[in-house]
Design a protein with these regions (language model features):
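A detector of single, family-specific signature residues
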Residues: 1-213
Length: 213
């Protein structure tokens, strides 16, 4: 699936190709709804946007199977392009023992998005802390390894007029401290969001009841 063009490859029960079409983002659902009987199986790679379109197709009565790209690749017969990929998906989904990806609900995608954003923010915060450590070391200041101690050291460095820091660097360091605090606040917001999700999710509730969790 491209962003604006959808390559469709249709086969019958004997895997004989019936039609190949390039459809636009605006009309592909309408064309499928008018052309393909409800209940027919539709396969897609589980790439970006696949879960959204899978839900839309399910709403129209189709059975949707998502396949991880690595399981489709062995069935691409020639040069990789949209048409060959669509044909490979058809072949892959008919293979016995093929493993499929469960279609995520909107709520499940929300949870995934929250965790992805939190993970990225955590990387940014670690990078910011390391940047601060590297800069202050050039001025003879030893930065604590743990971030909780770094937070405590920053205001002390800024207030200490005897540590040899120039006014220019103090302003720079104050800005970096502000950056770090913003990242801390965003992380705290997402931690609260994750806690709310855990309270409302039945699976998370059961996991929390396990010893050691």
């Amino acid at each position: 699936m491209a962003k604006n063009v959808f390559q469709v490859h249709g086969v019958d029960r004997k895997e004989k190709a019936l039609w190949r079409r390039r459809l636009t983002r605006e009309n592909w659902l309408k064309v499928l709804h008018e052309t393909v009987e409800p209940g027919c199986e539709i396969g897609m790679e589980s790439c970006g946007g696949a879960h959204h379109w899978a839900r839309r197709l399910q709403e129209k009565g189709f059975t949707v199977k998502l396949i991880a790209p690595q399981f489709v690749k062995p069935y691409v017969k020639s040069n990789k392009n949209d048409a060959n990929d669509a044909e490979a998906i058809c072949e892959a989904m008919s293979r016995p023992g093929m493993r499929f990806v469960a279609v995520k609900t909107v709520a499940q995608q929300d949870i995934q998005a929250v965790h992805r954003v939190r993970s990225e923010l955590n990387k940014q915060r670690t990078a910011k802390a390391n940047q601060i450590r590297g800069l202050v070391s050039e001025y003879g200041l030893v930065a604590p390894k743990e971030i909780v101690h770094l937070r405590r050291a920053l205001p002390r460095w800024l207030e200490d007029v005897e540590n040899g820091l120039s006014e220019r660097f103090r302003r720079l360091l104050d800005g970096l401290w502000s950056d770090l605090k913003v990242l801390d606040e965003r992380m705290e917001e997402l931690d609260r969001e994750i806690a709310l999700i855990a309270q409302s999710d039945p699976v998370a509730k059961r996991l929390q009841q396990l010893r050691g969790v």
